[in-house]
């Protein structure tokens, strides 16, 4: 009896144990279904060779960009210079056309005089051929009128020639031969530029080419801004070098500090805002 009761108890205990299994034990989860979403640090770690090549590429791109910007600014200045030269040439062409028209009009005005004189002489000779005395008087009157018209025509020619060739000597183009001449011409053009507020009109007023002034500008700027550097460059000797070579040496003598002063004076219109024709 005791054995049967113990078996029944164990069976009951077993049954209760089997029923309580799903509630007491934790569910078994497969660890393979969980994946890490955070990236590994090893994936972002690049080799040192790749990093150095990328840095070199960025430096080269920056250098090319800087060179492109400098070239763009130089081209912009060149365009402005060419536009001013174009305006100057247009003014010269307009002046030439207007002077040619005036000469043609003067020529046309002076031409009909002899024709009228010939017509008057022919009419007087043909209309009164029957009367010798009247014919002679008409011929003498025609000759007097012809001589008077001839004198007027000569006076007109003389006045036109004086107007054509009587240009003031101050407006004639002069060739500078030394540094003092370059400085004197530069100051004259600068004064005209400050009055007229136009580079092309200032060059036209003094009958000087823009490129000629630009090639000798470093000499004048060195004498105005930094005359103490003239000892480094030396005096100009026409027997040893040309004026263009001396101007290039003056350009190379302009250091960064002097160039900053020059640019500041150009912005304030105290120097001619003209670009250099030399390169370092």
From Swiss-Prot:
Record field: compositional bias (Low complexity): 133-146
Broad class of the protein's primary localization: nucleus
Phosphoserine carried by residues: 130
Keyword flag Coiled coil: yes
Residue stretches of biased makeup (Basic and acidic residues): 103-121
Basic residues compositional bias, start-end: 152-168
Keywords: Coiled coil, Nucleus, Phosphoprotein
One GO cellular component, as annotated: cytosol
Taxonomy, superkingdom: Eukaryota
Coiled-coil residues: 63-101
Subcellular location: Nucleus
Region annotation Disordered: where it falls in the sequence: 103-176
This protein's record includes keyword Phosphoprotein: yes
Motif Bipartite nuclear localization signal per UniProt: ranges: 151-164
Protein's job: Promotes the degradation of p53/TP53 protein and inhibits its transactivity.
Quaternary structure annotation from Swiss-Prot or TrEMBL: Interacts with p53/TP53.
UniProt name for this protein: Coiled-coil domain-containing protein 106
Lineage, top ranks: Eukaryota, Metazoa, Chordata, Craniata, Vertebrata
């Amino acid at each position: 009896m005791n054995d049967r009761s113990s078996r029944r108890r164990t069976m009951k205990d077993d049954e209760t144990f089997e029923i309580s299994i799903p509630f007491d034990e934790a569910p078994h989860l497969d660890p393979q279904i969980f994946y890490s979403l955070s990236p590994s640090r090893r994936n972002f770690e690049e080799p040192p060779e790749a990093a150095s090549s990328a840095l070199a590429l960025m430096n080269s791109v920056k250098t090319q960009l800087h060179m492109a910007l400098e070239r763009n600014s130089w081209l912009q200045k060149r365009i402005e210079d060419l536009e001013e030269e174009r305006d100057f040439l247009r003014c010269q062409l307009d002046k030439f056309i207007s002077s040619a028209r005036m000469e043609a009009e003067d020529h046309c005005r002076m031409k009909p005089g002899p024709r009228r004189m010939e017509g008057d002489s022919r009419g007087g000779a043909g209309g009164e051929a029957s009367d010798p005395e009247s014919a002679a008087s008409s011929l003498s009157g025609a000759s007097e009128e012809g001589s008077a018209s001839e004198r007027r025509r000569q006076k007109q020619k003389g006045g036109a020639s004086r107007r054509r060739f009587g240009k003031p000597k101050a407006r004639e183009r002069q060739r500078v031969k030394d540094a003092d001449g370059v400085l004197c011409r530069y100051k004259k053009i600068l004064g005209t530029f400050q009055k007229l507020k136009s580079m092309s009109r200032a060059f036209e007023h003094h009958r000087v080419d823009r490129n000629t002034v630009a090639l000798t500008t470093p000499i004048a700027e060195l004498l105005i801004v930094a005359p103490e550097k003239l000892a480094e460059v030396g005096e100009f000797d026409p027997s040893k070098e040309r004026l263009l070579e001396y101007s290039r040496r003056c350009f190379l003598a302009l250091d960064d500090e002097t160039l900053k002063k020059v640019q500041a004076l150009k912005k304030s219109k105290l120097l001619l805002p003209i670009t250099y024709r030399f390169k370092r």
